[in-house]
């Protein structure tokens, strides 16, 4: 009888542990939404920001200062004031990360797709994030505020994942700036590629216990950039920057600790980008086809030119030979 009781207790405990683990994993399911306000907001500017973000009385409020930006995004530069703000609402497990910039004209450096990819890299899960500012700003203050809010709520993100997230965002911003107005390029195409790569890396990790190799990362990066029409648009240096960032992601705590959830977040991000990008993604692919066709033409032309040169050389040789004889 005692054995039966003990066995039942053990079985109950074993059944309970996964639920406890899931509850621990989902402790980010906050009861109240969070409002992260730029520390320099006051009066009418604060009210306008709250209106833009739809902040209600039941929101928990945290302030983000220039010191916070220096702490969480150390390479952001010397910001003198913080106006960019954000809200975070948590969703049920498996619903991904959504980011919307409610004042797109005032966020000058970071796009919603970059925020989304950066959030996933940092290890944020199942969140609806809104960004806004009453003044034109880079938007880095809001991102630092998001990291701070997670720490304040007891859900501190892995510091290396945050560093990876910051580097990724800065590098993607740099790549976008360097390719701005280039035919066939779009920020949406780049960020769709990044989300696609992340999903495929997580899918690999789900199938293997060992660490993802650098060669696996490089193969996926090259394949995705080629499929999405960016291989011929980006420089070798830019491709290497992407490969380096994705290597960081492959080894990150965010991916390796829960590849299934990471893959789901990346997949949802990719779907969102594809849904909201219109024909921008197709334009990149079409441009790649045009470039490929032109390259093929040039290749064929070079072969034909070489053949003509050989024929001309033979003719010149024979002509010179006959001139010497006669």
Give residue spans per PLM region.
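Sec/Tat-exported extracytoplasmic proteins
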Residues: 53, 119-123, 149-157, 176, ...
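Positively charged n-region of N-terminal signal peptides that target proteins for export
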Residues: 1-4
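Amphipathic alpha-helical membrane/lipid-surface binding segments
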Residues: 259-314, 318
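Soluble oligomerization/assembly scaffold segments of membrane-associated complexes
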Residues: 120-233
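Long, low-complexity, polar and repeat-rich extracellular regions
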Residues: 24-64, 75-78
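Sec-dependent signal peptide cleavage junction
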Residues: 15-27
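Signal peptide-directed extracytoplasmic domains
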Residues: 71-124
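Bacterial N-terminal signal peptides
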Residues: 8-16
């Amino acid at each position: 009888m005692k054995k039966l009781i003990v066995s039942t207790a053990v079985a109950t405990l074993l059944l309970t542990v996964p639920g406890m683990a899931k509850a621990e994993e989902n402790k980010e399911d906050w009861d109240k939404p969070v409002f992260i306000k730029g520390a320099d907001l006051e009066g009418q500017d604060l009210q306008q920001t709250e209106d833009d973000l739809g902040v209600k009385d039941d929101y928990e409020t945290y302030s983000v200062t220039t010191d916070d930006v220096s702490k969480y995004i150390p390479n952001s530069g010397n910001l003198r004031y913080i106006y960019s703000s954000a809200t975070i609402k948590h969703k049920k497990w498996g619903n991904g990360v959504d980011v919307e910039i409610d004042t797109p004209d005032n966020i000058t450096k970071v796009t919603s797709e970059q925020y989304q990819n950066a959030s996933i890299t940092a290890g944020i899960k199942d969140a609806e994030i809104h960004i806004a500012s009453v003044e034109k700003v880079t938007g880095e203050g809001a991102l630092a505020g998001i990291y701070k809010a997670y720490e304040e709520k007891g859900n501190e993100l892995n510091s290396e994942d945050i560093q990876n997230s910051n580097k990724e965002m800065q590098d993607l911003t740099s790549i976008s700036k360097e390719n701005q107005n280039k035919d066939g390029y779009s920020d949406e195409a780049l960020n769709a590629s990044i989300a696609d790569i992340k999903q495929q890396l997580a899918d690999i990790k789900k199938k293997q216990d060992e660490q993802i190799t650098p060669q696996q990362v490089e193969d996926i990066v090259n394949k995705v950039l080629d499929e999405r029409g960016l291989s011929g648009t980006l420089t070798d240096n830019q491709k290497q920057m992407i490969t380096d960032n994705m290597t960081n992601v492959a080894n990150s705590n965010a991916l390796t600790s829960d590849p299934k959830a990471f893959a789901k977040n990346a997949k949802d991000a990719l779907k969102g980008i594809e849904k909201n990008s219109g024909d921008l993604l197709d334009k990149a692919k079409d441009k790649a086809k045009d470039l490929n066709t032109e390259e093929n033409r040039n290749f064929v032309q070079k072969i034909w030119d070489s053949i003509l040169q050989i024929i001309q050389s033979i003719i010149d040789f024979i002509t010179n030979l006959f001139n010497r004889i006669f």
